[in-house]
Amino acid sequence: MDNLQDRGFSTGTAASLACLFNPRTVAVIGASSVIGKWGQMILSNILAGRFPGKTFPVNSGGGTLCGLNSYRRIQDVTEPIDLAVITAPAGALREVVNECCEKGVRGMVVITSGFSEAGEEGRRLEEELVSLSRASQMIMIGPNTMGILCPHAGLFASGAHSRPGKGTVAFVSQSGNLGTQLIHWADQQGIGISLFVGSGNEAMVTCSDYLEYLESDPHTGTIILYMESVKDGRRFIEVSRRVNRSKPIIVLKGGRTEAGKGASASHTGAMHGETAVFGAACRQAGLIEVSAPSELLDLSAAFSSLPLPRGNRVGIVTLGGGWGVVTADQCNEKGLLIPDIPDNIVRTIGSFLPPFWSRRNPIDLVGTKDLQVPLVAVEEFLKWDGVDAVISLGIVGRHELVQLLVQSVREVDPDVSSSHLSQLESASREYEKAYVARMADLMAEYRKPVISVSLARTQEGTVRHQQGKPYHPVFYQTPEDAVNVLARMVQYHEYKARS
């Protein structure tokens, strides 16, 4: 067996997790050819995801699966196994785990359910598996988990066939179902993932252990958690407080109500503490607690893509007046300040706009068709030391409205040149691409976030990646989403400044 330290890993739980999340060899125990079975879904996902290491199907029937030789027992595999993904029935797990121990498997992801979440008999079996694993120094994730996704290692060992792109957001979820749904949505929104773990019942490895691993993981910059219970609350707070100083932790606590507590008890076998106590502990540790899954995605997009604001002063640039008014109200309600703009900015912006423009913050562009004015207004705010962040409203998204206009004109006015209409569409599309690229450049230059709201719903996602840039523009659907994200980023900045 090779030495973990020879592969660049330290010793302890974090080292064992590093081996699991960066394996060279993976065995799927309970592999199957029956579409829809866990053993088939996980094996096909690993192979379709182009895992660069070696994959070994293990099935009592032998034969071939997905074009690979299948082994009747894990001991029949001649090579060392870093990771075993186990989908065998709960009743067969004692024998399977014993065989993994004898083989010297580094660690297991136990997909199988029917343990502590199912009652006393399941709890005893779960404890027995933990004892067997500890005795062999073999780490166990789960049981009752959806699996793991490790994009940087090219490993997608989950029943759900979402294979997110590489990124800096790590997600630990006690619910595999909720976790994989959010991973799928994150991929659609352009949010790259460093790691996903369905932690399941956390019989051996707890959320605190994952945080300790992620603290030194070079691929991870932001951590999101979905938790239904906390094992060893004191350790969780100590670890999360330390990790949160360098990597923001965003947490959604399930089971905040009596109905939710009952549902999660039968779901993961969770035992709950007081919601108020958990919330107070999170605030003490500086964690960002949210109340909805969508907030996890909104905040992970911002924290992984934008520079952190250094204060709570906001400049607002809006294509039209109404959104600016609403956004200013929401900023004040969230503790964000809207400072008056100095005379030099008034003069600069005034040279581009008609005399009836607002001459104040928010800067109302009065629906200007001059494509340079939004860029000038945003940069004037960024250059000024009186604001810490900019919210841009309705600059991007006009292309979709132009498309609708062109479609209408094509239908009702045959005298308008088709090439002219195509040029209008092309010009609006290229302007928005240029605007997005310019926002990335401005954030890199001034180290201040620009948070945008799209005028219309787009299919391009929240994060617009710009190759080779340190920051990437983000676009939300509503002003309240943008304001909430900025307020949470300011909250985290203030925590870091105090700690």
Kindly label every feature range from the protein language model.
Residues 1-499:
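Catalytic-core regions of core metabolic enzymes
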